């Protein structure tokens, strides 16, 4: 099977969302023909890695977790030409904007199933993903709740299927109004990496409490620091991760100094390969995150045999209870949280070891091998159902691109949509027989309102690219 995956994050960036996108592509490439389309320093196809995965890079700028792609006419044409040549059976995007939107247009024109994994709760999209990592107040402010809802509604309507990570995500998508096909397929992990972790020695006087993730308001480390005030001094809180926004780590450090806490260790971001060794030394993994669709680090903690104490959220509700740690309500006080941590750390060795074993069993089915099988089955079902592009779909696509600013990008997309509507056979074969030197036809339709934010996509990407490049990005 030939699959084109799309992510807004380079390898090693974007937190759990970026990590799972690249890991999924790498795992797929072991048995399938796969390309990952993602930000890069230059636009073009890069050599494959040891698994056979190829990277098609889209020129982007930015030195943080998120890089802004420069969706110029040249870039869009290069991406379309590559997809025409690769001719994937399925296009699978992890984000509903920018590169993902361009990939969706190509898939619809070519009658190729388009799948989107929803890593966010649609009603709270601005609190997740790329916007969480952007340090660009102007762009963040432009993404109002109303606009983001319209974007998602229209993007979802052009998907052949959505993937929900769990039942809470499925419920959220249905509540949002999506009535199309949804597959429930969880995030995968390489469980073998954590299977060898030894359980922490519960008899040790010093107890290590670990949290792994970005330092951010959503992750709610403030609450963990407040809980630390109610724990003995030999309970050490280790915060592994970097701040998403400048000054946030310093804010947390000031809070520690105000409370006189010397037992909070800001360990910073560490290579993901070192996470198992940190979990192995942890007596409890703690989480006060306000929202987590399906947290990779909670899965990894459980896979390592580390009990979890957490405040209620989508992931904690799904995976954590008294058999593997403790789940508290959102309204629980920091003192109550601390009491639960101390209770777990005070268990007799045999009871603590039982928690550790239960934790491993809780996530035993979340290995990548199982996730890949579920995903392949979903793809095959979609391929069987996929019909040729209809006139209605073609009209919808024209409405989509008509909202783009006048210029070469809009003309390219309009031309190719119209050609796909006229030719019932393979678009790739059809394009090979047509002269691409013909001047692109002018747009004939009045701008529609179907995709309110689509027009801003190209503008925002180019403006954002220039802003980020102006911060000191190297030139080619």
Tell where the protein language model's regions lie, with residue ranges.
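Conserved donor-binding/catalytic core segment of Leloir-type glycosyltransferases
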Residues: 4, 201-230, 238
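Carbohydrate-associated surface elements
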Residues: 168, 188
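Short hydrophobic beta-strand element within catalytic cores of glycosyltransferases
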Residues: 307-310
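Short alpha-helical donor nucleotide-sugar binding micro-motif in glycosyltransferases
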Residues: 156, 269, 277-282
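Glycosyltransferase donor-sugar binding loop
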Residues: 212, 236-253, 268
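Aromatic "clamp/platform" in nucleotide-sugar-dependent glycosyltransferases that forms part
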Residues: 290
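N-terminal subdomain of nucleotide-sugar transferases
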Residues: 1-44, 51-57, 229, 398-401, ...
């Amino acid at each position: 099977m030939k699959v084109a995956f799309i992510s807004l994050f380079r390898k090693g960036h974007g937190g759990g969302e970026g990590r799972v996108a690249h890991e999924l592509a790498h795992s797929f490439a072991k048995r399938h023909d796969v390309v990952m389309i993602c930000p890069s320093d230059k636009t073009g196809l890069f050599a494959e890695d040891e698994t056979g995965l190829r990277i098609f890079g889209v020129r982007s700028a930015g030195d943080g977790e998120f890089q802004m792609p420069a969706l110029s006419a040249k870039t869009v044409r290069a991406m379309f030409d590559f997809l025409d040549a690769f001719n994937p059976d399925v296009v699978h995007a992890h984000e509903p904007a920018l590169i993902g939107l361009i990939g969706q247009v190509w898939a619809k024109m070519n009658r190729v199933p388009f799948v989107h994994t929803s890593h966010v709760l649609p009603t709270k999209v601005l609190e997740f993903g790329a916007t969480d990592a952007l340090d660009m107040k102007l762009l963040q402010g432009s993404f109002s709740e109303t606009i983001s809802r319209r974007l998602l509604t229209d993007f979802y309507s052009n998907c052949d299927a959505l993937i929900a990570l769990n039942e809470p995500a499925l419920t959220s998508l249905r509540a949002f109004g999506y009535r199309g096909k949804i597959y429930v397929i969880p995030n995968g992990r390489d469980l073998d990496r954590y299977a060898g972790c030894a359980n922490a020695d519960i008899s040790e006087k010093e107890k290590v409490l670990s949290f792994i993730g970005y330092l951010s308001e959503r992750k709610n480390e403030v609450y963990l620091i407040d809980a630390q005030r109610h724990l003995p001094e030999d309970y050490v809180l280790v915060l592994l991760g970097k701040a998403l926004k400048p000054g946030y780590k310093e804010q947390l450090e000031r809070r520690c100094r105000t409370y006189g806490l010397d037992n909070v260790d800001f360990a910073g971001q560490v290579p993901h390969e070192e996470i198992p060794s940190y979990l192995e030394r942890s007596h409890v993994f703690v989480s006060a995150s306000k929202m987590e669709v399906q947290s990779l680090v909670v899965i990894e903690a459980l896979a390592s045999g580390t009990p979890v104490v957490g405040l209620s959220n989508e992931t904690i509700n799904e995976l954590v209870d008294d058999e593997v740690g403790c789940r508290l309500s959102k309204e629980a006080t920091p003192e109550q949280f601390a009491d639960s941590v101390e209770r777990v750390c005070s268990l007799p060795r045999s009871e603590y070891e039982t928690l550790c074993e239960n934790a491993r069993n809780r996530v035993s089915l979340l290995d990548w091998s199982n996730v890949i099988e579920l995903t392949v089955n979903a793809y095959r079902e979609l391929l069987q159902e996929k019909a040729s592009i209809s006139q209605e779909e073609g009209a919808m696509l024209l409405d989509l691109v008509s909202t783009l600013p006048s210029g070469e990008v809009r003309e390219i997309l309009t031309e190719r949509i119209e050609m796909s509507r006229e030719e019932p056979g393979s678009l790739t074969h059809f394009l090979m027989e047509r002269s691409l030197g013909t001047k692109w036809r002018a747009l004939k339709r009045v701008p529609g309102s179907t995709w309110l934010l689509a027009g801003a996509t190209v503008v925002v990407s180019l403006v954002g690219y220039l802003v980020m490049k102006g911060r000191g990005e190297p030139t080619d």
